[in-house]
Amino acid sequence: MGAQTTLGALDMAGKPIQLRDADFVRSIERGLAVISALGRPGGGLTVAEVARAIGVTRASARRTLLTLEQLGYLRTDGRRFTLTPKLLALGHGYRSGLALPDVARPHLQQLMETTDEFCSVSVLDGDETLCVARVAPARIMNVAMPVGTRLPAYATCVGRVLLAGLHADELDGYLDRVELRALTPATRTTVPALRDELDRVRRQRYAVVDQELERGLRSAAAPIHDVAGRVIAAANVGALAGRVTVATLRRALVPPLRATAESIERDLAVAQP
């Protein structure tokens, strides 16, 4: 077959590097082709659809899909495979690759100026939430959660929004794996209580957490959907309990928060057609 030219790889003279056949890893090529195929709009793909899309046998497609699922880059409902937010960790890390952080940041800035509170966007990565974008007002006393912060999903408002968006079997698996430890006296630590709260989140389309993650911290979150209607992230506004009551959080902060999440959704649909 001869040498292959790698895309974007240049030698010291600025010429494309010729990659020998022996150095070309077909399984990596196949895995990236699968990710690319699943990145197109729609509700995921079956094994047969992936095989047709990338031009391989069903057996080969199945092995690649199961490998990527095992590594956490895909999820499946037993028939169709879809991408997971773990892809945010590829490339240059959680801040590159997908457009979410760049799209979200100006909207978070506007939300912060409206509410004068800490604002962020997080995704579900494994059993934890991962902060991918954030802004905060310039105050001595503030909520400290830099980009890259990981938190237990069950005890955070963004986590509950993301858990509420999971398929039933995915949520069952999460609840089987995770120990619901009390982080404060207010933390919900039983599966029935958490399920009831997730049902409430689905109905009202936002979550409020009152000092369950940390004493003195109240926060709200709203879902961010992709073009297929799946919950892919959550926007959050957080405040010190001494500044904001739960009633004020619901009345004054949740409406602009939900509007912000919807604005991010619209811009994401344009950025990732």
Feature names for model-found ranges:
Residues 82-178:
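Amphipathic alpha-helical effector-binding/dimerization core
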Residues 2-101, 262-270:
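N-terminal helix-turn-helix
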Residues 218-222:
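Short hydrophobic beta-strand micro-motif common in sensory/regulatory domains
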Residues 215, 233-273:
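Juxtadomain coupling helices with adjacent low-complexity linkers
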Residues 2-8, 13-14, 140-215:
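Short, solvent-exposed recognition segments
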Residues 224-227:
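Sensor-regulatory modules in signal-transduction proteins
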Residues 68-71, 118, 204:
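Alpha-helix C-caps/helix-loop-beta hinges
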